Regions:
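Solvent-exposed, non-transmembrane regions of membrane-associated and secreted proteins
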Residues: 3, 7, 13-156
Length: 156
């Protein structure tokens, strides 16, 4: 009976140790696959969008960016400003506004509206009040992400 209990304890300790050892690798693989799927889904929705809708979204974002330049003294956006912000470049309704690709580190990450904790747990956040990522003069787009989250390793 003692030998049987010792064997069970040894097996449990081995499985626990193996799980702890494999967790970083499995977690990294899982998060990479999740990011790839999210970006692929977003890309597919953008591809299916009508060209007029795409152009209208970009024009709206450029207009928003122009408004930021004229309101540069305001640091706290109003509720209507936030509502407008979250509606721009939100093609698939998930809050994702695009993605960033860094070929040198084989990294493709979703960019979401805002830098709330819930957003930063799953991807990169765009800082409200900074320019939307559509380019142009006098634009400064700020994104934020964590490198060493327990749930995801971004920019690595």
């Amino acid at each position: 009976m003692k030998k049987h209990i010792s064997t069970i304890i040894a097996i449990l300790v081995f499985i626990t140790g193996l799980s702890l050892l494999l967790y970083p690798t499995v977690s990294s693989y899982w998060n990479s696959k999740h990011q790839t799927a999210v970006v692929a889904n977003y890309s597919e929705k953008i591809e299916k969008m009508d060209d007029k809708d795409k152009q209208a979204a970009i024009v709206s974002a450029i207009s928003y960016n122009s408004g930021l330049v004229s309101n540069s003294g305001r640091f706290t956006p109003s509720d209507s400003d936030l509502s407008l912000y979250k509606s721009l470049l939100n093609a698939d309704g998930t809050g994702m506004m695009g993605y960033i690709t860094i070929p040198e580190i084989r990294c493709k990450l979703a960019i979401y509206h805002s830098v709330d904790d819930s957003v930063l747990q799953v991807g990169v956040g765009h800082l409200e009040g900074s320019s939307l990522p559509v380019g142009g003069s006098s634009t400064h787009c700020v994104i934020s992400g964590h490198r060493g989250l327990p749930s995801a390793r971004l920019f690595t």
